[in-house]
Amino acid sequence: MDRQEMFQGKRWGLFNHFLCVPAGDGTGEPCSPEEWNARVDAFDVELLAAQLREVGADYFCITIGQNSGHYCSPNPVYDQLVGISPSKCSRRDLIADLAAALEPQGIDLWVYLPSGAPCADAQAVERLEWVDGQGQRLASFQRKWEAVIREWSLRWGERVKGWWIDGCYYPDAMYNFPDEPNFKSFAAAIRAGNPQALVAFNRGLEDPFLPQCPWEDYTAGEVGDWLPIPGQKVREQLQGKKLHVLSYLGQTWGQGQPRFPDELVAGYTKLILAQDGILTWDIPLEPNGAIPQAYRRQLQALGRMLEE
């Protein structure tokens, strides 16, 4: 099957930064493994699945982890590589539980993961041989990170439909090589458990709609606090990839109250859909995984307006 067929019937989805510190925080005080496990255990996947169905989301994307070194799924390969005990990977496999709750609702599950080691965890950075913010080859790190990703991909199999990989800021230094590790081997690790998994590699805000390599399926599309209107130039550079836009409904990633009026949210969503694109809105969640009421109301309005 052509992976582009996986986008059929998909219009918009939601994203959540499920983390122990605010999104993007590389220095904040992390929680203990027990505190992290308590947070993961408190997530009611059935409640969220029902609310996602109610508001009409076609897919849901959640962070496996980011900078602190806490991940919401077990990974023995990661634990062996970094040697941290007790593990900062959760005992509960939240990703597997989410997938099981979403599938009966007809909602796909995507996952987010950085392309680098957790920068706020010094031991993980050292053991994985990661150098943050440098345009280096880092071949040894890449091999280790591919092994970590492969373990998760095989664990979840076809239940995870898409991946959004953050922080691919140095493609020419790290990935654009004919010999492995490269984008091809990176994508192969991601698709080890599901050859049809959709993949995007995020190069940052500078050119969010420029595909990085042949092994991507959609644009990373991170646009932050601005809402661009993709024009003819963007359509010409897609190279057969799906146009995708990622922004947040709150004040920033995963925080604050809704910043837009309902009409703007619906209008911009319609604009992207009219260009055969898809749009992902980031929102915060309550500690139990529920959509906060202000966002739930706005998303219900979005669903109604899209049907008008």
Predicted regions and their residues:
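Mature catalytic domains of secreted/periplasmic carbohydrate-active enzymes
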Residues: 1-308
